[in-house]
């Protein structure tokens, strides 16, 4: 008897022998962000889905990290394969409480101390917006994807997706300051050849975007000021 996972692994290994690298660049336009006006085009998630919808991916446990450091989530934008467990280590001298009540995954990992970590498994594709229940300025985005063929753009807008088997795909993008209509219009079919395939430059408009207003995990407004002396572990 030949086990199905052996067949799948063999096919993946064979595909990797002729796999290509997909490269390209993004540019952000119509932006009110100072960083974008300074030509910082980082944080755009680009991925490929097989045009025929058929995709076999290995059922291996994968993990990723989103740090909490200097009252920020690092990285601010994270892309992972569906089924990935994301760790949220607390590298600050104060407590944090990461949570999400948007789209891809609703979770609340609770209040936890400096130097500790908690995790959540993101098991279905979607966009997960992450916040802290204590610090209203902390936010991040996790793109949970149905495919292992993805990349996040660098500051210069360049991206590179390695190990893509030749074939027909649909290229999709997610950017935290673009509307759903803009992102949908950017979806395009792409034929990947062996070796390197270069995607035409992708221009993403931020016009029409409205900042996501969020409340705390209880659905209430954050206090106007937060005195961190109330939280164990805070520096006095």
Task: Indicate where each model-derived feature is located.
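Extracytoplasmic copper-binding redox domains, predominantly the cupredoxin/blue-copper superfamily
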Residues: 19-236
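Bacterial N-terminal signal peptides
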Residues: 2-16
């Amino acid at each position: 008897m030949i086990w199905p996972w052996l067949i799948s692994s063999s096919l993946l290994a064979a595909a990797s022998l002729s796999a290509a690298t997909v490269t390209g660049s993004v540019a952000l336009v119509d932006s009110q962000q100072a960083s974008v006006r300074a030509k910082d085009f980082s944080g755009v998630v680009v991925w490929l889905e097989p045009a025929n919808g058929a995709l076999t991916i290995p059922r291996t446990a994968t993990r990723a990290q989103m740090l909490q450091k200097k009252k920020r989530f690092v990285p601010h934008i994270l892309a992972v394969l569906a089924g990935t467990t994301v760790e949220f280590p607390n590298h600050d001298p104060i407590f944090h409480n990461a949570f999400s009540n948007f789209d891809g995954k609703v979770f609340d990992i609770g209040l936890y101390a400096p130097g500790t970590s908690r995790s959540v498994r993101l098991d279905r594709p979607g966009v997960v917006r992450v916040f802290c229940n204590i610090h209203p300025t902390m936010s991040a985005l996790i793109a949970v994807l149905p495919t292992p063929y993805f990349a996040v753009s660098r500051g210069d807008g360049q991206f590179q997706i390695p190990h893509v088997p030749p074939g027909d795909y649909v290229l999709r993008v997610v950017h935290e300051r673009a509307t759903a209509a803009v992102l949908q219009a950017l979806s395009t079919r792409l034929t990947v050849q062996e070796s390197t395939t270069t995607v035409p430059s992708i221009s993403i408009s931020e016009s029409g975007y409205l900042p996501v207003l969020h409340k705390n995990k209880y659905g209430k407004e954050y206090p106007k000021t937060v005195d961190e002396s109330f939280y164990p572990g805070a520096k006095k």
